[in-house]
Every structure is written in C-alpha cells, then in structure tokens.
Design a protein with these regions (language model features):
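Intrinsic disorder
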Residues: 3, 10-15, 19-29, 59-64, ...
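Short alpha-helical transmembrane segments in multi-pass integral membrane proteins
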Residues: 70, 74-107, 165-232, 274-329, ...
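N-terminal transmembrane alpha-helices
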Residues: 94-132, 145-160, 164, 189-196, ...
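Transmembrane helical elements of multi-pass membrane transporters/channels
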Residues: 105-124, 226, 260, 289-293, ...
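Helix-terminus/linker motif at the lipid-water interface of multi-pass membrane proteins
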Residues: 119-138, 207-214, 270-277, 337-367, ...
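Small-residue-rich hydrophobic transmembrane alpha-helices
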Residues: 137-197, 234-253, 361-425, 456-475
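Hydrophobic transmembrane alpha-helices of multi-pass small-molecule transporters
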Residues: 149-152, 264-269, 294-298, 370-374, ...
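Short runs within selected transmembrane alpha-helices of multi-pass transporters and secretion channels
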Residues: 158, 227-245, 256-264, 282-295, ...
Length: 535
C-alpha cells in the first residue's frame, strides 16, 4: 500500500465516547459494501467493511474518550495495486459476464457518444444552413469526400489499433497492449500532419475534383482551411476515443464525445453570428471542441494508475505492430476511401443532372441518415471489444450470441430511420433551410436514399464482426460490396438513362445487392463457428 493523503485531525466539539473505538473501512468509488465483519470487546470495537477492489480507499477512525470532546483521526490510503487489479478484472468480464449485459454496458455509452457525434455534425449543418445560406449547405456537402478520406486514414490506425488491442487484452498480453498504445499515437501524429499539409497545398484542385463549382468553391475552401490546420488534433481525438473503448473505458469515450458536442453547440452560434465568421466559424468551433476533449483523453492515458497508460519506450515504431494494425485497419480504410470515391461520383452526377441545389439536398439527406447510421456505429463499437476478446479467448458460443443481439438492435434502429425518412422528410429538410427549392430537392433525396435503409444495419454489424475477429479480407470485401463494387457501376449506368432519378435510385439498389452478399457470407461463417463450438 501507498500513503495517498496525510493524516487528518478533527475535533468534533460534542463528541465523547466512554470507550476507545477503532474502525477500518474499505470502500469503493461507488460506496457499495459487500461484506461486513464486526468484532467487539469491552475495550475496542473494530469494523471491517470490504468492498470491490475498485479505487480502494482505507479510512481509520479513532474516537478517544474525553469528558467534553473527542479527537477523530483519519488515515486515508489509496492502494494503486488493487486499482490495476480491478481494471484487469473489468477486462476479464468480457469473457464471463452475460453477453446481453456486456453489449448494453459497452454499446450504450458508444450509442450516446455516436448519437452526440451525429448531432454534432448536424448542428454544424443547421447553423450553416440557417445562418449562412442554402448555397453554403452545398459547399459543405462538397467537403464530404475530404471527411471520408480523413476518416479513412484515421480508421486505418484508430480502428486497427483498437481492434488489435481488444484481441491482445483477451489473450492477456498486456505488454503488447502498451506498445500498441504508443505506436498508435505516433502514427496518428505522423499521418495527421502529412494529410493536412498535402491537402492544404492542393486544396482548390482537390475541391474542384470533388464536384465544387464557382458558386460553392468559396464556402468549401473557407471551411476546409481551418479543418485541415487542426487535422492532427482530429486524428488523435478519434483515435484515442477508439482506444478508450477497447481498454474497457466506454464511458470515458462517451463523455469525451458529449463534451465536444456541447462545446461545439455553444461556440457555433457565437462564431457564426456574434463574430460574423460565417462558415469559418463553424469549422473553428469544431476544431476547438476536439482539442479540448483531446486534452482530457491525454490526461487519462497519462495516469500511471491506469492499467493501460503511456510509458517510455513504447513510442518507437515497431514493424510487427504497425503491420498488424494496418492489416486490421485496411477494412475500415477501404470503407471510408470507397465512400470518398462514391461521394465524388455522386456529387459529379448531381451537379451535372441537378445543379448545386441537388448537391445540397444530398448533404441534408446524408445528415438525416447519418443520425441512425451513427447509432448503429455505437452498437458496432460496443460489439467490437466483446467480439474481439471472446474470439481471442476461443469462446465461440458467446461470440455468436453477442453478434445476434447486435444485429437485432441495429435492425430496430434502421427501421426507425426508415419510418422517419418516409413519413417526415419535409420537417427533416426544414431543419436545415428555409429555401423552398432546396427543401423540394431534399424531400426526394431523403425518401429515395432511405428506401432500403432497414437492410444496412445487418450489413454494418456483420462487417464489424469480421473486422473484430481479425478477418480483414472478408470485412474489406463486404465493405467494398456496398460502397464500391455495386454502387459505382450503378452510378455510371443509371443517371444517363434516368437523369437525377437515376442518381438517387443507385443508392438503395446498391444496399439491396450488398445485403444479399453479406447474408450469404455470414451464414456460411456461422456454420463454421457452430461446428467449432460443438467441438
């Protein structure tokens, strides 16, 4: 044990006792006690209250008898060894606790965080649309490929490292887990700097390639200049959040996301309207919110009392660790990179057949769908450490069970999204703009884009499942099937025939074909898992 606080002395004026009393109290951070032992004698009374070994605190109370007053002495200790033991115990629960409770425990904070994240992006769009104008919404939509590309680079490291970390924790390889943390942070910094510098250098040509016109290039440029300057903070923020979830700290990851939403929501109207910064103000609010949350994340991983924390010697890049991170991260990288390519195709087709307003409508439709997609992402993030751990521990029956629960939860969410998109498209569009032309385009975009929305929950969970168990090739194939292999050919074939309707129709058609491929792949693998579980 280690002395955590110095001796404290209290002199309660009305306190007196006829006998000497000494008490030893062990209490966890929640204040719950699970065992009480009481020893009595004529001279001394000893209370020993034991609780779970989570942030164990030990208090020693002594009440010395006196006619008029008593002296209360308090000794306060913190046993850091037990704190680390409890962190490891929390990780071991991934293989023993009922999977339904685990999924709720891990997914709920992630769902709250992802919902907050979707609102975070939605708030930006609402303030830009209402405060700057309809054309600014179109300019913001032009930047979506940038976000996808940045997300692709970040996911290659962040998701790859967090998934690999879950597997290593399942194997109880804590030394490799520490090396993973250090290597992931260094890679995040390097890629963040390189990505931001290259994109800033060729910003205008890239934006025109992404579908910008003379009407939208100014808005897109102003927004991306600030976003790219703060790109390192963005990469670190999202990467450390993924590592927090993998390290059995989903609540801390949730708090970080909620914090960014609150700060961004407060700063957006101040920068856009009070300081009259326009779309630049929205970008600045986003970066500042992420930087503040990043400071808190770094404080968690800098705490030596944590089971997983920054250590000297873990920042030197190791080829074997980088290889494993990228092998797993190639799937989410491909998914985001393909999303970037697809959005470029969509923007180009929309500008050609529908004009800038059609691009803005796609941006609004994306934001509405994004809310429900991010909730499913929360379910996926809750599933990832559970699936990774149980796969690493060879607990196949638990693995199948938790995947089924995740599929059910994801399907409920996307069905709710489908109902919203089909019944309330006008009110959804009206949140972002008062321009009637943009609203009319958006109603069509929302309804058609979400036509087969109930199918994507299953597809997303299955992709996450294969990613979590290290099946990078299968996960990448399924990701490509929905976002690249089917959608791009449809975007090439349908628009010349059906014009703007062909662009919208390509999206649900791709969802339907990808669902069939995903279902066949998953059923085949489930049979293999059942066979292993029976053996």
């Amino acid at each position: 044990m280690f002395v955590h606080k110095t001796l404290k002395m209290y002199f309660p004026s009305a306190f007196a006792a006829p006998k000497f009393a000494f008490g030893l109290l062990c209490r966890d951070s929640t204040g719950k006690n699970v065992l009480l032992l009481c020893f009595r004698c004529s001279k001394i009374c000893l209370w020993l209250i034991l609780s779970r070994l989570n942030r164990v605190k030990m208090y020693c109370y002594s009440a010395f008898a006196a006619p008029k007053f008593g002296i209360l002495l308090e000794l306060h200790y913190l046993c850091t060894k037990y704190k680390r033991m409890d962190n490891r115990q929390a990780t071991l629960e991934l293989g023993t606790k009922p999977v339904g409770q685990l999924l709720m425990q891990y997914a709920l904070p992630a769902i709250v965080a992802m919902t907050a994240s979707s609102l975070y992006n939605m708030v930006d769009s609402i303030f830009i649309g209402q405060g700057v104008g309809a054309m600014a919404i179109s300019g913001l939509a032009i930047t979506f490929p940038f976000m996808n590309l940045s997300g692709a680079v970040g996911a290659a490291i962040g998701v790859g490292a967090s998934t690999y970390l879950s597997v290593k924790l399942g194997q109880k390889d804590y030394k490799t887990a520490e090396l993973l943390l250090g290597n992931a942070v260094v890679l995040k910094i390097i890629t963040g700097i390189l990505f931001g510098a290259v994109c800033l250098l060729f910003l205008d040509p890239i934006l025109y390639f992404f579908g910008a016109t003379e009407n939208t290039i100014g808005y897109a440029r102003e927004y991306m200049q600030i976003i790219l300057v703060g790109n390192v903070a963005t990469h670190l923020y999202f990467g450390l959040n993924a590592l927090l979830r993998a390290a059995s700290k989903p609540k801390q990851a949730m708090y970080a996301t909620i914090f960014t939403v609150v700060v961004n929501t407060i700063l957006d109207p101040i920068f856009i309207w009070v300081f009259d910064m326009g779309i630049r103000g929205a970008a600045l609010a986003t970066i500042l919110a992420q930087m503040l949350a990043l400071c808190w994340q770094l404080s968690i991983f800098s705490n030596p009392k944590e089971m997983l924390h920054f250590k000297k010697g873990t920042y030197r890049l190791r080829a074997d660790i980088i290889k494993n991170i990228l092998a797993i991260g190639i799937s989410p990288f491909s998914m985001n990179a393909c999303a970037c390519i697809v959005v470029i195709f969509i923007n180009t087709a929309l500008v050609r057949y529908g004009g800038d307003m059609a691009v803005g409508a796609y941006g609004i439709a994306n934001r509405i769908a994004f809310i429900f997609v991010m909730i499913v992402m929360g379910i996926k993030q809750g599933l990832q450490p559970i699936a990774g751990y149980n796969y690493g521990a060879q607990l196949h029956s638990r693995l199948i069970h938790v995947v089924r629960l995740a599929m059910l939860a994801a399907t409920v969410v996307v069905v709710a999204g489908w109902v919203t998109g089909q019944l309330l498209p006008y009110y959804c569009a009206r949140l972002f703009t008062s321009d009637q032309t943009l609203i009319n385009h958006s109603i069509q975009a929302i309804r058609v884009n979400m036509l087969l929305f109930p199918l994507i929950g299953y597809q997303m969970v299955v992709t996450c499942f294969f990613q979590s168990i290290g099946k990078a090739k299968i996960s990448m194939l399924l990701s490509l099937s929905r976002q690249m292999l089917f959608l791009v050919p449809l975007l090439i074939i349908l628009p010349p025939i059906f014009k703007i309707d062909g662009v919208w129709a390509a999206l649900p058609a791709s969802d339907g074909i990808a669902f069939i491929v995903t279902w066949v792949t998953m059923e085949t693998y489930k049979k293999k898992l059942r066979t292993n579980a029976q053996q």
